[in-house]
């Protein structure tokens, strides 16, 4: 089977197969780059490509065959062509593998490294949103999401390190409201050293997630730099959106700066803001805080 997809002669089939991958989302440009860089690997039935608690962080796209996902020696799911495996460790390189992945049949996979994924993500930022959607579905599969109703609304604030000033301003303006505002760096995540387990714990606790796009964040789109949320901000907002729903996952974006969002973020609740660190900071930011406050109070806690 691997011969069919190998070399220049097999490139058309590689591109076709990769275009159909969930993380690729039909993007032929992304599929073509993947076809050039990915390593094709033939896997025999019973062979293991990922070992639970392993420290590798490659990402695998399933081209043919099927793979069992095994946690603590118990098979829990089966993945098929179009699926990918290894996303969690690829997104958080210091995290150990959370499951074993073994071939249920003779299979073919395309492997890329974490570094290659990061490089692709800088050119095709939609891949982070798609990955977040897939991981959200897998979190739902675990069926651990029944929470007791909270007495106090909890609002979790996502941002890049560069936008922490905006996050802290929002927290201070909500100091006397009947809800708790928690920026990501205050006892939730450690800077540049958190895992998806940390995110999942916060998913279970919060009623709203507010992601702050910052004008200093940029991405390169067709050779032009555009303001855009950082990859981790888009990724985390996608996870919270998958759990909480679009009304409870809110994006705050700088007013008038033409922020570029992944195309499949359409429909996310957005609130524009003005942040002037030097002049009338609270007065200029106030309308955005008021709009967000009204939105939060209208929905309340999750039942």
From Swiss-Prot:
Q: How is the subunit organization of this protein annotated in UniProt?
A: Purified protein forms large 2-dimensional sheets when incubated with cUMP and shorter filaments in the presence of cCMP.
Q: Which Gene Ontology BP annotations are present?
A: defense response to virus
Per the UniProt entry, the Enzyme Commission number(s) are: 3.2.2.5
Activity regulation, in the record's words, is: Activated by cyclic UMP (cUMP) and to a lesser extent by cCMP.
Q: Where would you find this protein in the cell?
A: Cytoplasm
* SMART domains per record: cNMP (SM00100)
Give the catalytic activity: NAD(+) + H2O = ADP-D-ribose + nicotinamide + H(+)
Note the Gene3D superfamilies from the entry. Answer: Jelly Rolls
Region named TIR-like:
154-273
Q: Pfam families recorded for this chain?
A: CAP12-PCTIR_TIR (PF10137), cNMP_binding (PF00027)
What does the record give as the function of this protein?
Pycsar (pyrimidine cyclase system for antiphage resistance) provides immunity against bacteriophage. The pyrimidine cyclase (PycC) synthesizes cyclic nucleotides in response to infection; these serve as specific second messenger signals. The signals activate the adjacent effector, leading to bacterial cell death and abortive phage infection. A clade B Pycsar system.
Q: What is its main location?
A: cytoplasm
Which residues hold a nucleoside 3',5'-cyclic phosphate?
22-138
Q: Which InterPro entries match?
A: CAP12/PCTIR_TIR_dom (IPR019302), cNMP-bd_dom (IPR000595), cNMP-bd_dom_sf (IPR018490), RmlC-like_jellyroll (IPR014710)
What is the designated name of this protein? Pycsar effector protein BcPycTIR
Q: Which GO terms describe its molecular function?
A: NADP+ nucleosidase activity; nucleotide binding
Q: Which UniProt keywords apply?
A: Antiviral defense, Cytoplasm, Hydrolase, Nucleotide-binding
Using the UniProt record, name the top-level EC class of this enzyme in a single word.
hydrolase
């Amino acid at each position: 089977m691997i011969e069919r997809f190998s070399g220049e002669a097999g490139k058309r089939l590689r591109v076709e197969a990769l275009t159909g991958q969930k993380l690729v989302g039909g993007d032929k440009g992304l599929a073509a780059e993947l076809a050039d860089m990915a390593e094709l690997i033939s896997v025999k039935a019973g062979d293991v490509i990922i070992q639970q608690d392993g420290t590798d962080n490659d990402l695998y796209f399933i081209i043919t065959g099927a793979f069992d996902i095994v946690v603590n020696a118990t098979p829990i799911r089966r993945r098929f062509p179009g699926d990918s495996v290894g996303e969690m460790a690829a997104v958080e390189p210091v995290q150990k593998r959370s499951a074993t992945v073994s071939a249920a049949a003779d299979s073919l996979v395309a492997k890329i490294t974490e570094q290659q994924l990061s490089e692709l993500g800088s050119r095709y930022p939609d891949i982070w949103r798609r990955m977040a959607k897939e991981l959200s579905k897998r979190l739902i599969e675990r069926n651990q999401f029944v929470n007791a109703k909270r007495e106090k609304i909890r609002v979790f604030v996502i941002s890049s390190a560069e936008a922490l000033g905006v996050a802290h301003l929002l927290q201070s303006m909500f100091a006397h409201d009947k809800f708790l505002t928690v920026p990501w760096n205050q006892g939730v995540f450690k800077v540049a050293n958190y895992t998806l387990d940390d995110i999942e714990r916060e998913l279970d606790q919060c009623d709203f997630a507010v992601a702050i796009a910052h004008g200093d964040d940029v991405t390169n789109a067709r050779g032009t730099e555009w303001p855009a949320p950082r990859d981790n901000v888009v990724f985390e907002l996608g996870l919270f959106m998958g759990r909480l729903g679009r009304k409870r996952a809110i994006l705050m974006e700088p007013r008038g700066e033409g922020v570029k969002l992944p195309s499949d973020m359409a429909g996310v609740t957005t609130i524009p803001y003005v942040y002037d660190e030097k002049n009338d900071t609270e007065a200029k930011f106030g309308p955005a805080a008021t709009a967000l406050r009204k939105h939060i109070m209208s929905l309340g806690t999750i039942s």
